[in-house]
Amino acid sequence: YVTATASFGGKSGKTVESDRFLIYEEGAFDLMPRIAQHYGVELNTILADMRMQDCLTRQGNRIFIREPKNTTAYSSGVLSEYYKAIIDGLLLGRAENCEFGYEPVNLNTGNFYMEQTDATIADIGGDFALTRQYNAKGAAYEGSLGFGWTFAYDERMGELADGSVLWLRNNGGIITFTPAGEGYLAPAGCDYELSETENGYVVEILDDGSRHEFDSFGLLRAVEDSCGNRTELAYDVDLYLKSITTPSGKEFRIALDEKNRLSSITLPDGHGVTYTYDEAGNLAQVTNPAGGVVRYVYDDSHRMTAWYDENGHRVVANEYDGEGRV
């Protein structure tokens, strides 16, 4: 807080104190409602004090938090070292410029990358699948499925201090769009177009005609294919995903555990997928709608060392070098 005392002619008046406040420096993928929730203040109070026109955070911006009820530093837990690693290159995830061989190993980087499907149903425009991806070189990232994993709809938009816009993709990679005139440029070789809307951003995938729509918080709200079939996402008041609705209107309901990780997904037919975590925060096992259990084992750095199928057979055994390469 700030104190001030008026003085005139050698005489001092009453000393007054300002409201207590703190200054928070934004990260590229922070969410304003969660910052407000952490410090125990109303989101509208922050927006009014800062005269903010939208809620999309920008790396390096400083936010004035008036009368915080909690003064411990906020950390979104998003990206950290993982974020820095991806910004250095686009070789995490199954990108266009990556060569894979043997198991799902990126031969450019030695990164172990794996995609698995938990459930599939028939729907308009083709099968609708619940998928998740694992990146060993992204094991420092703790997301909605523990360390190293991303969910199919874990997509976000964020901004850097220089005005670049980041697209955090569902395969664990990041695409950086750089400002160019009144628009943005995608990296060379990437067939994407980014446009700004009244409500946020839209990314168009030129090779298949699909589009990904993001709101003013940078959260994914809808995916639409070239035929206009839309998958829509809904969030709770704290901006955690609560449901996914397919083009035909079928709903997948999301449940979270006490640490806001995916606990279960209930399918339209009432069956479900459950997710269990070990004490270190790793995704330890997944139980599919048929009752089959897949197990995962990790080292102390959250890198997957083995996984076992529904029959208990070990499918993969990984060893890593000092650089985290398989």
Regions found by a protein language model. Give the residues of each.
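Short secondary-structure "cap/edge" segments that initiate or terminate local elements
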Residues: K69-D191, D309-V326
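Extracellular LysM carbohydrate-binding repeats and other cell-envelope/extracellular binding modules
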Residues: T5, E42-G77
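Extended, loop-rich substrate-binding clefts of extracytoplasmic carbohydrate-active enzymes
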Residues: A186-G209
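Short, solvent-exposed loop/turn segments at the edges of extracellular beta-sandwich modules
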Residues: T5-S12
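Aromatic-rich beta-strand edge motifs centered on tyrosine
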Residues: Q116, L130-T131, F177-P179, S195-T197, ...
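Beta-turn initiation residues at beta-strand->coil junctions
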Residues: R169-N171, I205-D208, S216, A222-G228, ...
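Primarily a LysM-type cell-wall glycan-binding module
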Residues: T15-N44, N61
